[in-house]
Amino acid sequence: MKKVRLTREGYEKLKKELEDLKRKFMYEISERIKEARELGDLSENSEYEAAKNEQGRVGSRIMEIEQILSNAEIIEDSEESDEVTLGKWVVIKNLDTGEEHKFRIVTPQEADFFAQKLSSDSPLGKSLLGRKVGDVVKVKAPSGVQRYQVIAVMNK
């Protein structure tokens, strides 16, 4: 598997999720399976089926996170510059509506729109990478082409 680029914050978040899932996997789900087995006939035991399904989902996620972390390359904060790169915060202005938005450009594994983390693989993320303060980018959206100007770029 190729290297997976993550910010330090994203790496730590995945480590915590892995710890939490392992704890859940080892204790909570195992206990639920044990309790469901004690109820008798497993062929018609919906609690047992639900616990086994959750065990499968959690186990898959644990393996996925372990693979990501074992292949992780941490993106360290770079020197202050006005160029948009992975891990940087960027303020953009929609030139059609005048609205300003602030995002952190992150890898797809870390993307979270509600936490203002924009995937570098998204149309907007791709168009912003390598741009500098003052640059204007055009992005195709369902509502048509949107124009954004880079207002600020910062590490934090």
UniProtKB/Swiss-Prot annotation:
Q: Which GO terms describe its molecular function?
A: DNA binding; RNA polymerase binding
Question: Which InterPro entries does its entry note?
Answer: GreA/GreB_C_sf, TF_GreA/GreB_CS, Tscrpt_elong_fac_GreA, Tscrpt_elong_fac_GreA/B, Tscrpt_elong_fac_GreA/B_C, Tscrpt_elong_fac_GreA/B_fam, Tscrpt_elong_fac_GreA/B_N, Tscrpt_elong_fac_GreA/B_N_sf
Which segments does the entry list as coiled coil? 1-32
**What processes does the entry annotate via GO biological process terms?**
DNA-templated transcription elongation; regulation of DNA-templated transcription elongation
Q: Name one Pfam family in it.
A: GreA_GreB_N
Supply the alphabetized keyword list. Answer: Coiled coil, DNA-binding, Transcription, Transcription regulation
The keyword Metal-binding is annotated on this UniProt entry: no
What's this protein's function?
Necessary for efficient RNA polymerase transcription elongation past template-encoded arresting sites. The arresting sites in DNA have the property of trapping a certain fraction of elongating RNA polymerases that pass through, resulting in locked ternary complexes. Cleavage of the nascent transcript by cleavage factors such as GreA or GreB allows the resumption of elongation from the new 3'terminus. GreA releases sequences of 2 to 3 nucleotides.
Family classification = Belongs to the GreA/GreB family.
Any idea what this protein is called?
Transcription elongation factor GreA
Q: Which organism is it from?
A: Thermotoga maritima (strain ATCC 43589 / DSM 3109 / JCM 10099 / NBRC 100826 / MSB8)
Lineage at the top is: Bacteria, Thermotogati, Thermotogota, Thermotogae, Thermotogales
Q: Which gene encodes it?
A: greA
